[in-house]
Amino acid sequence: GATALLLRTADTGALAAQLEGVVLPAIGIGFEGDAATPDHYHTLMALASERGDDAGLLDIDLGLGPLHALAAGLALHAEAPAAHRLFRVDGWSRHNRGLTAAQELGLITAGLAAMLRGAASAGLNAGDIASRVSVRLALPADSFAGVAACRAMRRLWDGLLSACGIAPTPLVLGGYASLRMMSLLDAEVNMLRTTTALLGGAIGGADLMTGFGHDLLTGEREAGQRTARLVQVMMMAESGLSASLDPASGSPFIEQRTEDLATAGWAAFQAIEAAGGLADAIDSGMIEDQAEAASARREQRLRAGDSDLLGVTLQPVAGPVPDASAEFAGISRPAAIVEHLRRTALASPPRLLILRGASDSAAGEERAMRRLLAMAGLQPVILGADEAEAITAARPDVVIGCGMTAVPHGLAAGSFRAAASILDSGDRLGCL
């Protein structure tokens, strides 16, 4: 990364090779997945000792979860320097599976509560453990949503500490660019999405941010990784946004949006607590059900035309659709339904004919139908209703009438659909 490394390798023996040539005190070092273990932490400490580095000066985020790895993290607490973060509560991964922003904040808050509760039950000072955690929050393409999410997360943390009688403690907040927002179609647009996502994190006050190459879904190339790193540094440093503690403070729009999101996030947290806490909410399927329901609502908005995606439903580019790597199969991407539609259409493209009538509505309906068909990568032939010979020669599978409700008398054409009925269907993808 630009200023930090995130390690995922399960083999502790590979750690020395991975960090060869790396000045440990100069960067942040994080662990996740199979690498987030006490063994990896001890291996890193031994490596730092061999190099003569002061362990207390290292910026370490071990990334232990607040549920199943809680005991392991609490056991490390006594020996680890105070600056080392042992726990991480990850809302980003659940965001990618479909959770709304409020549900994600509620889940993170529930994870933080579980950590503090577990520390108190183990006889430790929960206030000391409060400084041992970081959170991972999703940054969507909507910059304002990212700003509000970061600011609301800090409000929820402050509220949780206050409710627990713990003195205010800074929360290390990591903003991660959403993977849910990405598309295989016109993948270069993902660079724009990542830029606006990280802008939201920078204005919202994220302590660290991570972006991804625009081609991540099909395998990041070096150029994509470099661009993502440059965007991160631009937003965190060169933009100057980090010079202010809270660049968005005082904006009525941002303040209200933050307040509304914090209120909704606290309600989501209370719902999880009422279900028995985060562990029970996950085991019962409550969190997964929330993600599926939110994804379904998101899909419905896309179908109805209430939301759009650049390069997917707006300004789509014709061409084949690549396949995403298997590791991203669990991500609930709104663009996926359009990608599937494009693959289906390209596998067996129908012969489409747009028949233009003489009514005043014909031109507008034609433009709307061309935009709609472009979502599926379909290119229709366009003829006037009076071009009988050309219509017969086209041998269309489907005739779409613009400014007309039926095929002109005497013309033999394929299945006829009136453009008006298609455009008014309420499901622009289903009609395709």
PLM-predicted stretches and their roles:
Residues 1, 52, 157, 204, ...:
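Conserved, mostly hydrophobic/aromatic
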Residues 2-142, 146, 164, 171-174, ...:
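Catalytic alpha/beta active-site cores
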Residues 115-119, 153-160:
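Short, well-ordered amphipathic alpha-helical segments that serve as non-catalytic structural scaffolds
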Residues 121-132, 161-172, 238-249, 272-285, ...:
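Flexible, glycine/charged-enriched surface loops at secondary-structure junctions
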Residues 134, 138, 145, 149, ...:
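Catalytic alpha/beta core domains of metabolic enzymes, predominantly
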Residues 264-351:
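Intrinsic disorder at enzyme termini
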